[in-house]
């Protein structure tokens, strides 16, 4: 069922945006699905913030779910599978600039989370070969891993009552770091996939990023690909623990996000994609690059025109 290899994120469409009708109607259109399919991709990852699918009173918003149904239809029309990623839930966001807190302690927030996924299961549980569920984007702090292991396993239990075989993706803490996959509890479910994100070496992929604290990464620091240390050997070492954990537990690995900020040169970005792709391919790791359009990482942006035809070979 879960046989995807080459994907593209639709970041900024139903997440990390102003949620205006114009944004939701026009940021991504059918033409974009056609373009992604023409690149040889086999799936898209759709980040969704709860703001799109919940009303202010926390009831389910039919209009928002209808938008996701349409996105699935557009993907299927173009021969693409789709990962639904809950990018932000009530009481939690990976983004430190967003005022959300309490999810890991608050049972009310957790029940809303379960309710969202039960709805997704009702809508798409009959499509286990084409629609996959990613429960939550980028758990941040180490202190959250114990409650998160409990929460995601309860969520899987509730989904399974409705969608018994849909592949479900689960990531660990430090923003889905590949180094923390080993802290996920082994599930008694053959259709759980271990999920991670990879923006390493961070000083290269996030150079100049305005949202990264200055004491973590000086904003004026620039790092070329040749200076970055990004080699096949580097990524082999970085992924080793996660690969071993997945083998031990009989699970597949998936990289839900990876990419390079648009401050790096297109040529350096291409070089990075070539190297990480070699390791993905060697170990059979499915992946979805960040991101299709804008969001500081867009591979369809004009600046990438000269290298895009080559880059898409290495998605």
What are these regions (language model features)?
Residues 1-167, 172-180, 191, 296, ...:
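Active-site mouth of glycoside hydrolases
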Residues 4, 105-232, 236-261, 275-278, ...:
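Active-site region of glycoside hydrolase catalytic domains
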Residues 59, 68, 249-269:
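An exposure/low-complexity boundary signal
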Residues 265-315:
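Aromatic-rich peripheral "rim/lid" segments of glycoside hydrolase catalytic domains that contact
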Residues 63, 100-103, 185-188, 211-213, ...:
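Short, hinge-like loop/turn segments at secondary-structure boundaries
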Residues 14, 185, 200, 298-300:
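Generic, ordered loop/turn and secondary-structure boundary motif
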Residues 10, 196-198, 292:
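Active-site donor-binding loop signature of nucleotide-sugar glycosyltransferases
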